[in-house]
Amino acid sequence: MKTMTCRELGGSCDLEHHGEDANEVIKAQDRHLRQAVAEGDVDHQTALTEMKGRWKRPVSGLKWYRRVQRDFAALPADAGVR
């Protein structure tokens, strides 16, 4: 299990997302951004818009995805978790 924050994934806060792989934390970030914006949090709107835009621009979106996977792989496992 590893941890990445909203900010590390392009967001505006330090909420921690935990997962066994990068895809799990990306999905958690997606849910977090959508929920925050739905609740009226304008600080997260930019990150949500950028996330949606990645799917419209596959080359830059894939570059972001690969960077997140690389960053996730470089993280140490969470303490106390095997």
Predicted ranges, named:
Residues 1-82:
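Metal-centered catalytic cores of metalloenzymes
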